[in-house]
C-alpha cells in the first residue's frame, strides 16, 4: 500500500485485524460511514455472509488476469471474489528419513504404495527411530487438517464422478476411503490413537522438525516453519506427495491446490472509490 501511494499519489488505508478477529473487525468497519472498499471473504461460507456487499468483478482487467475461473468466487454468473493467494497441500515428506527406511518418493504413487511404506516403517519403528506420520491431533489447532483438508478429497471425487459442482448433501460414495486414509494416519503415527484428542498443531510440526516422522499432512504455508535460518531442513530434504485415498487416476494425481481467501470490492462505495480500488488491485497483481 505504501509503495502504491509513493508511485501514484493515491492514499491507501489498511486496517489490520487481530489474529482470529477478521470477521468481527470487518463487521465493525462495514458499519462505518467510510467503510472499506476492499475486503476479503473465506470462500463460499464467507461469501454467504457478505455477497450483498460484493461488486461484480466480471469483465474487469483484474478478472482478466485470472488463468482459471476456478480461482474466482462466483454467485451464478457474477464474479464476486478473486483468490489472491494460491496454496497447495499434501503430505510433506522428509526424504532423508524415507530413504533411511529404504524408499524414495518415487516409490509412492498410490494409496496401496503409501500403506505398504507406512506399515513397514511402523513394523521397524524401534529399529529406525522414527514413525511414518506425525500425530493427527484433534485439538482445534490441528483438526482442520482432517475435518476440512482431508475431507475435501472424498467430496472432490464424488463431485467428479457425479459431474456436479455443488450439492445440498453428499452421498458419501468415498467415505470408506476417507476412513482408510485417516486410519492409516492414526495407526502409524508418533503416538497412540488414544492420545490424539490432546495433540495440537504445534505437536505435529515439532515432531516433524525433530525427525520423529516421515510424513506431515500440511501445506505450502508451512514452508517458513520448516526451511530457513535456524530451521533443520533445506529444500533438498523435503518434498510434498499427493494425499492418495485409493480413488481416481492416482498415477496422475497432483497436490490439492486452491485458495481459501478472496478479494472482494464493496459495491456500496462510490463509483470513484470502486474504480480506485480496482486500479490498486490490478497494480498488486501486475506490478513488478
Locate the predicted segments by residue:
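Short helix-initiation/N-cap motifs at beta->coil->alpha
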Residues: 16-25, 109-113, 195-210
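Short, solvent-exposed loop/beta-turn-alpha elements that line the ligand-binding surface or hinge
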Residues: 56-69, 133, 137-140, 155-180, ...
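Extracytoplasmic/periplasmic substrate-recognition and gating elements
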Residues: 7, 77, 99-101, 190, ...
Amino acid at each position: 500500500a505504501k509503495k502504491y501511494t509513493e508511485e501514484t499519489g493515491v492514499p491507501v488505508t489498511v486496517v489490520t485485524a487481530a489474529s482470529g478477529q477478521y470477521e468481527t473487525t470487518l463487521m465493525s468497519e462495514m458499519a462505518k460511514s467510510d467503510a472499506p472498499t476492499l475486503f476479503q471473504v473465506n470462500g463460499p461460507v464467507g461469501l454467504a455472509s457478505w455477497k450483498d456487499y460484493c461488486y461484480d468483478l466480471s469483465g474487469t482487467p483484474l478478472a482478466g488476469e485470472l488463468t482459471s475461473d476456478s480461482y474466482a468466487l462466483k454467485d451464478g454468473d457474477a464474479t464476486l471474489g478473486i483468490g489472491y493467494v494460491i496454496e497447495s497441500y499434501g503430505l510433506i515428506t522428509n526424504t532423508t528419513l524415507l530413504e533411511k527406511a529404504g524408499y524414495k518418493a518415487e516409490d509412492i504413487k498410490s494409496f496401496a504404495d503409501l500403506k505398504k511404506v507406512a506399515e513397514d516403517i511402523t513394523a521397524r519403528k524401534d529399529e529406525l527411530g522414527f514413525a511414518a506420520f506425525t500425530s493427527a491431533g484433534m485439538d482445534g489447532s490441528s483438526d482442520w487438517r482432517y475435518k476440512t483438508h482431508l475431507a475435501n478429497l472424498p467430496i472432490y471425487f464424488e463431485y467428479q464422478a457425479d459431474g456436479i459442482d455443488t450439492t445440498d448433501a453428499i452421498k458419501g460414495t468415498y467415505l470408506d476411503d476417507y476412513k482408510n486414509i485417516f486410519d492409516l494416519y492414526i495407526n502409524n503415527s508418533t503416538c497412540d490413537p488414544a492420545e490424539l484428542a490432546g495433540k495440537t498443531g504445534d505437536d505435529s510440526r515439532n515432531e516433524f522438525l525433530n525427525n520423529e516422522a516421515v510424513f506431515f499432512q500440511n501445506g505450502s504455508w508451512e514452508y517458513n516453519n520448516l526451511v530457513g535460518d535456524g530451521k533443520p531442513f533445506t529444500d533438498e530434504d523435503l518434498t510434498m506427495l499427493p494425499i492418495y485415498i485409493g480413488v481416481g487416476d492416482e498415477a496422475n494425481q497432483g497436490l490439492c491446490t486452491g485458495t481459501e481467501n478472496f478479494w472482494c470490492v464493496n459495491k456500496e462505495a462510490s463509483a470513484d472509490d470502486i474504480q480506485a480500488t480496482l486500479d490498486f488491485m490490478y497494480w498488486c497483481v501486475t506490478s513488478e
